[in-house]
Amino acid sequence: MHLYYLGPKGTFSYLAAKQFESHEQYDFIPLSNLHEVIQSVSKDKQAVGIVPIENSIEGTINIVADSLAHHDVYAHGEIQLDIDFSLYGHHSNSLDDIHKVYSIAPAISQTINYIHRQQFDYDYVDSTIQSLNMIKDGIGAIAPLGSGETYGYHTLDQHIQDYPHNVTRFLVVKNHTHFIEHPNTTIFLITPKYDKPGLLASVLNTFTLFNINLSWIESRPLKTQLGIYHFYVQADTAINN
């Protein structure tokens, strides 16, 4: 059985996947981007995928929200992971030698104040671990705390995220529904057939009517025309209720 995640080994997705508890034995399959993770799960009945959906600093991970909407996959659980970044560089460099850094877009966003204070230029790669491959004289990488040492790189600075309480929520996804013995939350994707005044309010008021708390609401464009959306709603209730 396969477990797909955004690789390579050492990414936050990998660390979240290591926290995934299951009675099944999974072969870890690293993939190059998050869309590919969800697409692979949708085609593999025996697979599970681990994807980030929300960060306490950045908010919703849009590429994941959009990919979930366009593939037949279902959330079976979630994992919360503390996010801690370090700056890595060439062994001959100090912090003062660095003029540019690389990382994945969410990592850049979550360390942007630090980047500006250091007056670094920055650019993007597809994963935090891939950024380590960009390291050379004067070029650094922003990657998970402890990951750079594994690949033989030098730590230039630690705990560089802009906010100390940085947590990412990951979803455990499969391509089929499955009975969960004691579910306590449900994620809905609501796609209205047409737009009208008060549409979202009427949807949310339905949950209020039944005294159901909502812990996450996110709108994403349908990508058909401007102003037309579907909505993710996470309700603190079991789906069979």
Where are the language model's segments positioned?
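Domain-level signature for soluble enzymes in the chorismate/prephenate branch of the shikimate pathway
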Residues: 1-241
